[in-house]
């Protein structure tokens, strides 16, 4: 596997999105995003020391710092259910938000704006939550948003829940599996209607 510039940035910030730490997302993200004019990023699921502290030298907001460095002109937003995940830094702003609460999701979009270029769902990883969040937030975001759901174990279940959307599972190497060697670290790209 080729180590991309984004892989190196991800490793530097200790996010689990890079192959050297956990997932093989950053090589795919690099190819997908390297030529895109990304100005606004919103990631749901920031991570806390309780959930990510097993990664040596982990810092809260690791992936937000990765996006901030990779997109030097972008405003980066993060949202999480835990108050322990809140950080503020240059071009990074975080908000409390429960991905299963429609009103909180609407308030989040009111705060960050609907003109998000890249949205990543890295929150609870529960299929029902992933479907609910996509169905709730996609109509509030601009049509050409790049919407990615991470840590997908059963993409067919999510696709059924999002039947009105065009969903695509890109081919990436896998490092984590459910029983019967079914990958549980897939990505799902959802195209807004």
What are these regions (language model features)?
Residues 1-149, 153-193:
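A short alpha-helical cap/connector motif
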């Amino acid at each position: 596997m080729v180590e991309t510039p984004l892989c190196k940035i991800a490793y530097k910030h200790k996010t689990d999105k890079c192959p050297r730490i956990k997932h093989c997302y950053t090589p795919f993200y690099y190819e997908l995003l390297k030529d895109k004019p990304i100005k606004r990023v919103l990631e749901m699921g920031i991570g806390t020391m309780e959930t990510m502290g097993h990664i040596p030298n982990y810092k809260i907001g690791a992936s937000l710092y990765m996006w901030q460095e990779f997109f030097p002109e972008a405003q980066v937003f993060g949202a999480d259910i835990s108050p322990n995940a809140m950080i503020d830094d240059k071009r990074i702003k975080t908000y409390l938000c429960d991905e299963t609460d429609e009103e909180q999701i609407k308030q989040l979009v009111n705060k960050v704006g609907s003109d998000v270029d890249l949205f990543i769902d890295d929150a609870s990883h529960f299929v029902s939550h992933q479907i609910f969040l996509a169905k709730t937030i996609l109509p509030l975001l601009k049509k050409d948003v790049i919407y990615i759901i991470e840590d997908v174990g059963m993409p067919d279940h999510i696709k059924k829940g999002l039947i009105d959307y065009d969903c695509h599972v890109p081919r990436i190497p896998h490092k984590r599996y459910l029983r019967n060697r079914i990958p549980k670290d897939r990505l799902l790209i959802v195209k807004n209607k």
